[in-house]
A protein has these predicted regions:
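Solvent-exposed, conformationally flexible loop/turn segments
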Residues: 7-10, 44-53, 84-88, 114, ...
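Conserved "repeat-terminator" motif of extracellular CCP/Sushi domains
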Residues: 3-29, 79-147, 152, 243-281
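Calcium-binding motifs, dominated by EF-hand helix-loop-helix domains
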Residues: 189-191
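Terminal, regulation- and interaction-focused segments at domain boundaries
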Residues: 39-42, 51, 202, 207-209
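Acidic carboxylate motifs that coordinate Ca2+ or other divalent cations, activating on Asp/Glu
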Residues: 196
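Surface-exposed interfaces of beta-sheet-rich extracellular modules
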Residues: 1-3, 52-86, 208-253
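Local beta-strand/beta-hairpin segments that build beta-sheet-rich folds
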Residues: 35-43, 159-169
Length: 299
């Protein structure tokens, strides 16, 4: 402290004590680096409460794609200015850059989009960092598919007309979106709908940001030829998805969306007609024979 010399030795000297100003600093740093994103320098009297909150700056950083790791100011047990003018108080707030995850785009029809696999690093730029778990991957909600199943059946039944010549056909249109995750554990922060890698809709959102991974339409599917059967004329078109003459299932007329229902379509077949050869009287009758199929025409 300061030494006071009395003006009149032997008499009481009045000494007025004044609290000095103290300084404190709150730094926002990126985890695992020396990068300081922001610094607030504060000043106040010794012993006075530090009038400050990290909420505003953390909200700004979140909007810029950062997630809180530790808040050394809010969790501090003593948030008053100290009494040591020689040493400034330092509080550290640590944040981490969020990671956008976009599924792969299928290269072949009916191939599924792919997310990372369990054991892969959550942040590809930090291969030695935290790894994906199956539990975290299952919660990403960034891949959906609309399926179309075509079954070729005998008219009036649910029996397949020929599992070998006319096997059941299933195809799909897949949709993906970019999920933004916390690099520490892969938990969902939100979804990126603008393409900048930053979450702009909440983690609870189920409808935003979806895009078709390839074509958004089901392609035309010609009905197969089945020996002894022809497609039934005047088919149920099932919402104009099946050609009335049964020759094909139509191409989608409009783009599908992630909310489009799955399609379960039936193409019906009937037996071909028969003919009975006429033989001279007294000859052994010949059993009726089915008309032969046109190998290029299911009808």
């Amino acid at each position: 402290g300061k030494v006071v010399t009395p003006q009149k030795p032997g008499e009481d000297t009045r000494i007025v004590l004044v609290k000095v100003n103290q300084k404190a600093t709150v730094k926002y740093v990126v985890e695992g680096t020396d990068t300081v994103l922001h610094k607030d320098e504060l000043e106040g009297k010794s012993g006075a409460p530090i009038d400050y909150t990290t909420a505003t700056k953390l909200a700004e950083l979140k909007a810029g794609g950062y997630e809180l790791v530790t808040d050394g100011f809010t969790t501090a047990t003593d948030k008053n200015y100290d009494n040591n003018p020689k040493v400034d108080q330092d509080f550290l707030v640590t944040v981490a850059k969020t990671v956008p995850v976009t599924p792969t785009t299928p290269q072949n029809p009916n191939e599924d989009p792919q997310n990372p696999q369990p054991g892969d690093p959550i942040n590809p730029e930090n291969p030695s960092g935290p790894k994906w778990t199956k539990e975290a991957l299952d919660k990403l909600n960034n891949i959906k598919s609309v399926t179309r199943t075509i079954t070729y059946i005998k008219d009036g039944t649910t029996e397949e007309v020929s599992p070998t010549e006319a096997p059941k056909w299933t195809d799909k249109v897949s949709f993906t979106r970019t999920v933004v995750v916390n690099p520490k554990d892969g938990s969902v922060v939100g979804y990126d709908t603008t393409g900048d890698g930053i979450a702009d809709v909440a983690a609870t959102d189920t409808t935003s940001g979806w895009k078709a991974a390839g074509t958004a339409k089901f392609t035309e599917k010609t009905s197969p030829v089945v020996k002894g059967y022809v497609v039934k004329p005047n088919q149920d078109t099932q919402g104009d998805l099946v050609e009335a003459d049964g020759s094909k299932v139509k191409v989608s007329t409009t783009d599908l969306t992630v909310d489009s229902p799955n399609q379960d379509l039936k193409v019906r077949y009937v037996p071909v007609g028969t003919w009975t050869p006429k033989v001279p009287e007294g000859e052994t009758p010949i059993n009726p024979s089915p008309y032969p199929n046109d190998p290029t025409d299911p009808g």
